[in-house]
């Protein structure tokens, strides 16, 4: 795992098209912004895991995450 230190307003690049920007830090919470092309899915881990579980169970959710 790559570990980076960023300050509020600083950005990191993932490949050529995805950026992750630190928007704010408040206590133990960090707000980040992600810019990615439409064809790149971006989800919180718990949402991604739910999507994967639904795929495995053959169900489709409403898509409202």
From Swiss-Prot:
Gene3D superfamilies: Translational regulator CsrA (2.60.40.4380). A key translational regulator that binds mRNA to regulate translation initiation and/or mRNA stability. Mediates global changes in gene expression, shifting from rapid growth to stress survival by linking envelope stress, the stringent response and the catabolite repression systems. Usually binds in the 5'-UTR; binding at or near the Shine-Dalgarno sequence prevents ribosome-binding, repressing translation, binding elsewhere in the 5'-UTR can activate translation and/or stabilize the mRNA. Its function is antagonized by small RNA(s). Signal peptide: none annotated. This is Translational regulator CsrA. One of its GO terms (molecular function) is mRNA 5'-UTR binding. HAMAP family: CsrA. Keywords: Activator, Cytoplasm, Repressor, RNA-binding, Translation regulation. Homodimer; the beta-strands of each monomer intercalate to form a hydrophobic core, while the alpha-helices form wings that extend away from the core. One of its GO terms (biological process) is positive regulation of translational initiation. It holds the Pfam family CsrA. It comes from Photobacterium profundum (strain SS9). Belongs to the CsrA/RsmA family.
